[in-house]
Swiss-Prot record:
The lineage of its organism: Bacteria, Bacillati, Bacillota, Bacilli, Bacillales. Pfam families: Ribosomal_S7 (PF00177). One of the primary rRNA binding proteins, it binds directly to 16S rRNA where it nucleates assembly of the head domain of the 30S subunit. Is located at the subunit interface close to the decoding center, probably blocks exit of the E-site tRNA. The gene is rpsG. It comes from Bacillus cytotoxicus (strain DSM 22905 / CIP 110041 / 391-98 / NVH 391-98). GO terms for molecular function: rRNA binding; structural constituent of ribosome; tRNA binding. Belongs to the universal ribosomal protein uS7 family. It comes from the Bacteria. This is Small ribosomal subunit protein uS7.
Length: 156
């Protein structure tokens, strides 16, 4: 922890095409080896696929998908008297979006389609329809929190 107080949050610039900070954060999350241009191309192509398949604005579909992925509760390990308890805690808004974006990208990468554009587009569409691996991850996280409700009084 820093001695000079809390570290200031770095603000990302909105992306040029959709003028959204969320999209920029997704681009940054997908980026490998600093290749931001490639990451942008992949995302914009994925959004084109989403527009093609749904006929809706891709930003709306993406925001709905993210809303369906973002967790409300998670468990954190807390050591009490030599035993580790999984204590359910509420997820802060900033962490919610971060986890949502992380899960979206990770589970898109694990999909079987040929290109990353198709994988990402399909994962976004699945998440928007409340199906898919990233939504299952959120459900599992909530289930864990529900199962460990008894330890909620250990919250800090």
């Amino acid at each position: 922890m820093p001695r000079k107080g809390p570290v200031a949050k770095r603000d990302v610039l909105p992306d040029p095409m959709y003028n959204s900070k969320l999209v920029t954060r997704l681009i940054n999350k997908m980026m490998v080896d600093g290749k931001k241009g490639k990451s942008q191309t992949i995302l914009y192509n994925a959004f084109d696929i989403v527009r093609e398949r749904t006929g809706k604005e891709p930003m709306e579909v993406f925001e709905q998908a993210l809303k369906n992925i973002m967790p409300v509760l998670e468990v954190r390990a807390r050591r009490v008297g030599g035993a580790n308890y999984q204590v359910p805690v509420e997820v802060r808004p900033e962490r919610r979006t971060t986890l949502g974006l992380r899960w979206l990208v990770n589970y898109a990468r694990l999909r079987g389609e040929k290109t990353m554009e198709e994988r990402l587009a399909n994962e976004i569409l699945d998440a928007a329809n409340n199906t898919g691996a990233s939504v299952k991850k959120r459900e599992d996280t909530h289930k864990m929190a529900e199962a460990n409700k008894a330890f909620a009084h250990y919250r800090w």
